[in-house]
Amino acid sequence: MAERGYSFSLTTFSPSGKLVQIEYALAAVAGGAPSVGIKAANGVVLATEKKQKSILYDERSVHKVEPITKHIGLVYSGMGPDYRVLVHRARKLAQQYYLVYQEPIPTAQLVQRVASVMQEYTQSGGVRPFGVSLLICGWNEGRPYLFQSDPSGAYFAWKATAMGKNYVNGKTFLEKRYNEDLELEDAIHTAILTLKESFEGQMTEDNIEVGICNEAGFRRLTPTEVKDYLAAIA
């Protein structure tokens, strides 16, 4: 009850030491579509559920797995409009880095800068935290990277993780299946199986998205490729 008076203030701590608006933002993430990231020995895979709004909806108009540079991509759980703002900011940050240094931005540098943007929205008046968590993958210095950033601006490197709806089940499944010698092909199968743990209804190439990142760069798998992977695990 004592927390209620602080729930509308972003910049004021509650008596228990919480910023309640951040707690609400994390709740938006936990209620969002599940997403999975797995770092393999030779690349990274991102996978997420993509709900079909209507048979009239043009699914090519909006994607959940997005490239930022040739070697970095990301996915989200939470609020789609907030995600698209962060995608735009991430691309702009990557372009600014390239203009200054004439080389692609390292994955860890981009994660740090995007997380700083998210953190600024936890201590400014007249704004609210972003209602998304991001999984950011990349390839540089001859190795793969996977990071998660949450609405507070905190970020961590991961070997494999799940977020969004039923993320606890996803993480438990990954803990049983993951090993550091995993190849990218196996990681793709594992990511899809992890999504399947909490998937409602029939999983098809139209309601999930998968992205991969390796030495060749980042790309989103085509629906035909996703269909083949689904057939392989059926």
Swiss-Prot record:
GO terms for cellular component: cytoplasm; cytosol; extracellular exosome; extracellular region; ficolin-1-rich granule lumen; nucleoplasm; nucleus; P-body. It is found in: Cytoplasm; Nucleus. The keyword Nucleotide-binding does not apply. The modification N-acetylalanine is found at A2. The modification Phosphoserine is found at S7, S14, S16. Phosphorylated on tyrosine residues; which may be important for nuclear import. Belongs to the peptidase T1A family. Component of the 20S core proteasome complex involved in the proteolytic degradation of most intracellular proteins. This complex plays numerous essential roles within the cell by associating with different regulatory particles. Associated with two 19S regulatory particles, forms the 26S proteasome and thus participates in the ATP-dependent degradation of ubiquitinated proteins. This is Proteasome subunit alpha type-2. It comes from Homo sapiens. The gene is PSMA2.
